Amino acid sequence: MIPVVALVGRPNVGKSTLFNRLTRTRDALVADFPGLTRDRKYGRAEVEGREFICIDTGGIDGTEEGVETRMAEQSLLAIEEADVVLFMVDARAGLMPADIAIAKHLRSREKPTFLVANKTDGIDVDQAMADFWSLGLGDIYPIAASHGRGVTSLLEQALLPWVDEVNPQEEVDEDAEYWAKFEAEQNGEAEEEPEDDFNPQDLPIKLAIVGRPNVGKSTLTNRILGEDRVVVYDMPGTTRDSIYIPMQRDEREYVLIDTAGVRKRGKITDVVEKFSVIKTLQAIEDANVVLLVIDAREGISDQDLSLLGFILNSGRSLVIVVNKWDGLSQEVKEQVKETLDYRLGFIDFARVHFISALHGSGVGNLFESVREAYDSATRRVSTAMLTRIMNMAAEDHQPPLVRGRRVKLKYAHAGGYNPPIVVIHGNQVKDLPDSYKRYLMNYFRKSLDVMGTPIRIQFKEGENPFANKRNTLTPNQMRKRKRLIKHIKKSK
């Protein structure tokens, strides 16, 4: 299961700045997921191949009443649901009473905690950190989050070793061996399909059903299963946890993951329900294909788009399900379709199904799109095929000039699966404009007939073998150089 990292501390110690660096966003609000309390934001971070969910909390104001009574509720919950805590302090301001109170609370929870001293740029670090040793939280990691200084050391020395410990590579997925064989494909003949003893079709498809509360996720699960396996009640929040249910359909095995709804922020009052939001995100990370359920009567909300953003960032295959389609007039249906085209036009690769989970209409067609998305995400493509498609794309639309030179695309190969990753090697490819990168992505998608899954393009440039090297002069060149030096000295 993907680990959860919480950032806690007093106001204005730099939590959001570090959050933005870890999640690679410019504004913490971009990753503001509904279903959490007002000042709590979270996003997906990936560092050197390790993935984790990062939570940014509102500042904790420890006063004379004590941190237990004055600590913001969302920050307390972030500590509870996190696997590890990054406790941030302000090195410029020094040790404050609130820092002491927060440290006391963290020690009582016995959570793995790393003490991070921020704003260390331009000051004597050793002197600034001296007082913080009294907090009794072990080593102190000095950083300057606004400039990125020390963040790499924090990751390499503290966070990444911990992620490896709680989420070892061999436990990531049962099909890791299969994908490892895919990675080794490039060493063989380009067109030859290696003989594999293992096939992705032998694995059950993990199918997560996500959406806002009361959009009909559990009703859809029960309709698919043909039994009342999940509690259903016409009231938001009746599903408290992610439920894993194995099933078989059309001689294919599946694991259905019914999740709790992601609710509008500020409207969650039950502690148990707040915990379920993290489990929803973890279910998305664990799934192969995600069914995003939208209520046709309520339309697309910001919560739907936020959840959609997390699904896309995770690289999961996607099928959009518009539920409660029955009973709507033709005029309303046309309006809903226009809204979908307008707000979801950027994900034209995903199939959209209009269904009624309650009555079962349209549900049977979902699995055709699920299988199509899974097959697209796990399909194996040879280096020769990808290179041929790349060359056709370059012939149809030449790469632009960069600093007076034409960008050269050399070859392409598969860099990963689920989602499909195409790695393109060439000269100056990292300088390609975003418009041409999108063109290549769409060209590969159309040529490979990829449907239901995002496709990613990565660019790599070969190292210059003559970089940082000086030419060795021949004996004649050395003699000529000496004569020139003597001539210059005489002329002076």
UniProtKB/Swiss-Prot annotation:
Is this entry keyworded rRNA-binding?
no
UniProt binding sites for GTP 1: 9-16, 56-60, 118-121
Q: Which positions does UniProt annotate for GTP 2 binding?
A: 211-218, 258-262, 323-326
* Full protein name: GTPase Der
Q: What does the annotation say about its assembly with partners? A: Associates with the 50S ribosomal subunit.
**Which gene is the coding source of this polypeptide chain?**
der
Enumerate the GO terms in the molecular function aspect. Answer: GTP binding; ribosome binding
Residues of the KH-like domain: 379-463
Keyword Protease present in the record's keywords: the answer is no
A GO biological process of this protein is: ribosome biogenesis
NCBIfam families per the UniProt record, alphabetical: GTPase_EngA, small_GTP
Family membership, please give it: Belongs to the TRAFAC class TrmE-Era-EngA-EngB-Septin-like GTPase superfamily. EngA (Der) GTPase family.
Q: What does this protein do, in the record's words? A: GTPase that plays an essential role in the late steps of ribosome biogenesis.
Q: Where is the EngA-type G domain?
A: 3-166, 205-378
Which keywords does this chain's UniProt record carry? GTP-binding, Nucleotide-binding, Repeat, Ribosome biogenesis
Q: Which domain of life is it from?
A: Bacteria
